[in-house]
Amino acid sequence: MVNYPHQLIRKTTVTKSKKKKIDFANRGMSFEAAINATNDYYLSHELAVIHKKPTPVQIVKVDYPKRSRAKIVEAYFRQASTTDYSGVYKGYYIDFEAKETRQKTAMPMKNFHAHQIEHMANVLQQKGICFVLLHFSTLKETYLLPANELISFYQIDKGNKSMPIDYIRKNGFFVKESAFPQVPYLDIIEEKLLGGDYN
């Protein structure tokens, strides 16, 4: 084949594809995004007002090139002191944590911290509705586990072992995903927690 006009032979190059790096910090973001979309749905339909709490940030270093242009150059996320979400539904205070795992048989208890367990106990003491949404991404299953069930399990060994999915299925409630809202947890609160079916 003639490569007119310069008679050059084109070199073919093979580009190596880089292995995709797994970002473990954001692995729960799709579940979190589904919860946020659910909360937006509840808000827009005037069913509930529930928001994600901002993660506390510790500012370490600020650069002041000009007095009016302060720039944060170093900051770190602090460990959250309470739960992920809070709000109000029909006059009831709602407070919950959301966790996701790829495991098929258990939810790692190392995902829960002592101060979160203490916070949940305090919410229950004040008659608030407190729970955790547990998502098993490999199984595509989500459960609402009342906080008192989480606290009972946590007290066995202060959160050193994993919570078996059988315990979650027995003591929690399956959340059937839908299009709108994606994670309809208010249905369970209404039917099971406020409806008197749960002690």
UniProtKB/Swiss-Prot annotation:
InterPro entries: Resolv_RecU, Restrct_endonuc-II-like, tRNA_endonuc-like_dom_sf. It is found in: Cytoplasm. The record marks 99 as: Transition state stabilizer. GO terms for cellular component: cytoplasm. It catalyses: Endonucleolytic cleavage at a junction such as a reciprocal single-stranded crossover between two homologous DNA duplexes (Holliday junction). Disulfide bonds: none annotated. Its cofactor is Mg(2+). The keyword Metal-binding applies. Belongs to the RecU family. This is Holliday junction resolvase RecU. It comes from Streptococcus agalactiae serotype V (strain ATCC BAA-611 / 2603 V/R). The lineage of its organism: Bacteria, Bacillati, Bacillota, Bacilli, Lactobacillales.
